[in-house]
Structure formats: C-alpha cells, structure tokens
Amino acid sequence: MRIVALVGDLMDQSRISASVPSVTFVSDVEGTTDADIIVIDLARHGRAVAEVRRLAPDAVIVAFGSHVDEERFRAAEAGGADRVLPRSRFFRDPAAALAHGDGP
C-alpha cells in the first residue's frame, strides 16, 4: 500500500512520519497519481483536492485543516476528499486517522 502526503510543513511531516513510517511526501499533485492513500494539508494545498481526485480516482483522500475553516472543509468534501478532519483529531494519531478516518 502506497501512502503519499501532500504536506509541506516540516513539523507536520515529522509528526506524520513518526506514526506512518512508510509515508512518501510529495510537493505537487503529480506525485499522488499511484497512491492508495493520500493525505492533504488543507492549509497549504486545499485547492488541490479536486485535481488529486482526478489524478487518483481510486485513492482514499484524507484531508486535515483548521477546525474553524468550515468553508475549506466543505470545499475539500466537494472536491472529492473521503475524510476531512480537524488538525487536532488527525494529529492525535495519524495512523489511526488513515485507517479509521478519525483517530482514537
């Protein structure tokens, strides 16, 4: 299973890779094409969700962002994200968020 993350923040990358060592970080949507699971940071790549869905129609897309940014959450869902989580819930346990959608 190939897990790809469109996450640019180094601290976020560190937290994700500590929980999901097999993750591959990419800097653009083209890097997501052959992934099974794709993580998207909505703060930096929120507008990319629809393009990622187009390039990887069968992948599970898990997006995270600020809990107060309801508009971005709705846009991510409309763009094809399977799961959209507040940052706090996603980072509580990234591996569980990818497996179950919402962590413990």
What is each stretch, according to the model?
Residues V39-V52:
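Conserved phosphotransfer microenvironments
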Residues L10-V26:
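Two-component/phosphorelay signaling modules centered on CheY-like receiver
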Residues L42, G65-S66, S88-R89:
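Short secondary-structure boundary segments
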Residues A81-R92:
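Output/docking surface of receiver
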Residues R2-D9:
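Conserved acidic segment of CheY-like receiver
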Residues A96-P104:
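Receiver (REC) domain switch/output surface
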Residues V49-R83:
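Mid-chain, well-packed structural core segment of small domains
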Residues F25-D34:
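Short acidic low-complexity segments
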